[in-house]
Structures are given as C-alpha cells and as structure tokens.
C-alpha cells in the first residue's frame, strides 16, 4: 500500500484529504509537527507528499527546496494560491505537480496515481 504524507495546516482540509486517500486505498499520514517537517518526511518512508504552500514555521516552497536536497519523493503542491508565479516557483523548486484549491477529488487522485506510476512507486 502506497503511503502519502499530507502537509496542510488547515485541519478540515487535512481530514478531507486523509479520508479521500484512505477511501482510494492509500495509507495516509497527516504531519502535525511542522517545526520538524523535513526530518519527519525523511524518516517516514513515504511514497508521495501533498504539500501546501502556507504552513507554519516555514513556507511550503522553502520546505520543498529542502526536501529536494535529500530525496526525489514526488511532491504535489495543493494550495489556494492560484497565481502563475507560485506555480512557476513550485515547479522550478522541484514540485511534480501543482493543484489549486478547491480541487476536484477525482483529478487529484488521478494525478497522484500518475505521479506514482511515473517514478515506478
């Protein structure tokens, strides 16, 4: 079973994503301690990350840059920021995909599946 980490500061959205992933057959993990996000990611043996840009302690794009220094785990940015600049920055920092809220659950699941298949996970 593929394990997906949710890094989202909005607890309602985190729970919605969790339920969506579990119902689709994934193992889901919600990151609750944002102060040690990179360390939690590296020790959790996950297959994919859903990452919001607006998270406590540091910007999600900065966390993405740090993640990319250590691992090639697929990262999908899931954010309310629908401007081109944030999307360009996220992709240039190594995001595999960029989805804006509100998102279509079907589209999100298809993109997760495609990103996992692309890297053979």
Where are these regions (language model features)?
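N-terminal/domain-start alpha-helical segments
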Residues: 1-120
